[in-house]
Amino acid sequence: MVMADTNETTTDLVPTNQERMFALSQREAVGLSKSGLVPKEFQGNVANCLIAFNLAKRIGADPLMVMQNLDVIHGRPSFRATFLIACLNQCGRFTPLKYRITGEGDEKTCIAVANDIETGEEYEGPPVSMAMAKAEGWSTKSGSKWKTMPDLMLRYRAAAFFARTTAPEVAMG
């Protein structure tokens, strides 16, 4: 009997920690993909669930919470404003977000503001106005909440812009 010459050692046969973690994530993703509580983009789609698991791991969040607050816009994952606000408010870097609203009509503008907890320095996000909402087409889409809840939508958009420009690590890990 001739034994095959191999350079494999027994340690090559033992899965690495990374491989074990991926296998565990994959099993969890399969389970969640079968749930009716996850959004339709994740139902029956293990690959999308794995991407959500990756995002959750990077930002230290629960995978189901990430899935329920993630929208796919033009093929890219984008967190809902309420999720970004929650992440910012609990990250420990800033005071809770506040909003400055000025003007009326198309000139109504909202700026999200927070202070750095360590230094007290104030940070402002980019201004968001009703004129911007119209120019970008946000307020003219069918079923748009910009028509019925403009103040809330201004706050949401201003908060999302603040998160993306001032603290992108909060949502990207």
Where are these regions (language model features)?
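Polyanion-binding surfaces on beta-sheet-dominated domains and ring/shell assemblies
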Residues: V2-G173
